[in-house]
Each structure stands twice: as structure tokens, then as C-alpha cells.
């Protein structure tokens, strides 16, 4: 199974890269967790933010192949417990399609990305910093896998 986090923003601090890679490497070979970074467009004082979001959305969708699943991470998405995420992870595994987890930039996701989503997931009603979201997603995917495999990490 292939999971990809497609996220707007690059040049993250080293601790973010280390945290992400720590959880990605803990997963078994049959569960690949990849990160695809989409460069954040420069936002000047007079920037057309709607156009920038649309461009970022186009770049995100260009990384998705036909037939792949899109799951958006949105404040107004559905909150999942660890056990519910494990259930979703198992469904995705049985579905045998690549799953693309989409995280937008500071202003969120382009409407075109949201329109293509098969599922909408909310990590929290709080606004979370994007570097932390990457690590949180990696850790929660790892934790969900440990639930499915009976590993003692999740007690």
C-alpha cells in the first residue's frame, strides 16, 4: 500500500524532516509513506491569494494519478479516533489504491482539490502549524498500523 502526503510548503526545519522520516521508516515495506512537497507561492502585500491557492491546487493535483484516492485534511473534515483511522487504513489497504493525503498552504486547499476528495479528515478543530501537522500525520499513520498489527506501541 502506498500513502503519500502531498503538502504545500517546503524548506521545513530539520526537526520536521527527522520526525517525518522517523515514523515513515518504522512502517513495514508493504506500507510506504511518502512526502511530496509543493512549493508555497510567494505571498506579497498585493498578491492575488485566490490565484496562488488555485496554482498550488493545480500543482497538488498534478501529482495524483487517475484512480488514486484523495483525502483532504480540513478543519471541517471528519475527526477520527486512532481506532477509526486504523479502520480507514485497513479499508485503504483492501482497496489497493494509492492514497493521497492533501494538506494546503496557509489559506487552505484550493476548491478544486476539495471537490476531488473522497474523504475529508480533520486532525483537530485547532489551527495547527504545518510543520507539526506533517509529524502528527506520520505518527498517527504509524500508530494506526500498530493497532492493526497488534504492536504494543498503541496501548
Swiss-Prot record:
Its EC number is 2.1.1.177. Keywords: Cytoplasm, Methyltransferase, rRNA processing, S-adenosyl-L-methionine, Transferase. Its main location: cytoplasm. It catalyses: pseudouridine(1915) in 23S rRNA + S-adenosyl-L-methionine = N(3)-methylpseudouridine(1915) in 23S rRNA + S-adenosyl-L-homocysteine + H(+). S-adenosyl-L-methionine binds at residues 73, 104, 123-128. The keyword Transcription does not apply. GO terms for cellular component: cytoplasm. It comes from the Bacteria. InterPro entries: Alpha/beta_knot_MTases, RlmH-like, tRNA_m1G_MTases_N. One of its GO terms (molecular function) is rRNA (pseudouridine-N3-)-methyltransferase activity. Belongs to the RNA methyltransferase RlmH family. HAMAP family: 23SrRNA_methyltr_H (MF_00658). Homodimer. This is Ribosomal RNA large subunit methyltransferase H.
Amino acid at each position: 500500500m502506498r500513502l503519500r502526503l502531498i503538502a504545500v510548503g517546503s524548506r521545513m526545519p530539520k526537526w520536521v524532516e527527522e520526525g517525518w522520516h522517523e515514523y515513515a521508516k518504522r512502517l513495514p515495506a508493504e506500507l510506504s509513506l511518502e512526502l511530496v512537497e509543493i512549493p508555497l507561492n510567494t505571498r506579497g502585500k498585493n498578491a492575488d491569494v485566490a490565484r496562488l491557492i488555485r496554482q498550488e491546487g493545480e500543482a497538488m493535483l498534478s501529482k495524483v494519478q487517475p484512480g488514486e484516492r484523495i483525502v483532504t485534511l480540513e478543519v471541517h473534515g471528519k475527526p477520527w479516533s486512532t481506532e477509526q483511522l486504523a479502520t480507514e487504513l485497513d479499508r485503504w489497504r483492501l482497496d489497493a489504491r494509492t492514497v493521497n493525503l492533501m494538506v494546503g498552504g496557509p489559506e487552505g486547499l484550493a476548491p478544486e482539490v476539495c471537490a476531488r476528495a473522497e474523504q475529508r479528515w480533520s486532525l483537530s478543530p485547532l489551527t495547527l502549524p504545518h510543520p507539526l501537522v506533517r509529524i502528527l500525520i506520520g505518527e498517527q499513520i504509524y500508530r494506526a498500523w500498530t493497532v492493526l498489527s497488534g504492536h504494543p506501541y498503541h496501548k
